[in-house]
């Protein structure tokens, strides 16, 4: 009986990394950053491949801005999109995606252009 419990615990510990979800490691522009000029790119880095299914950039008035993405919806660990030139204001980036394990994820962050 004790052997079965130890064996089950060992299997659970070894399998845990296989079920871990991807996490967002970094974003550009940085969260709550204040920029002197429009950013050259909107980017995210993940610890495991992620298929970004939606990325949106809006200003404080809810107006949408186009983002040109170059990944073709392929799973990536580094995602980047090029925004049009942004006028001064507050901006929100919202995204959603699907991790390699099928788990859906989403998030948002803000930045300001002076």
Regions found by a protein language model. Give the residues of each.
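N-terminal non-catalytic regions of secreted/periplasmic and cell-surface proteins
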Residues: 20-55
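Acidic, low-complexity Ser/Thr/Gly/Pro-rich repeat segments typical of extracellular/periplasmic
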Residues: 43, 47-112
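N-terminal signal peptide c-region/cleavage motif recognized by signal peptidases
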Residues: 10, 15-17
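Bacterial N-terminal signal peptides that target proteins for export
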Residues: 1-7
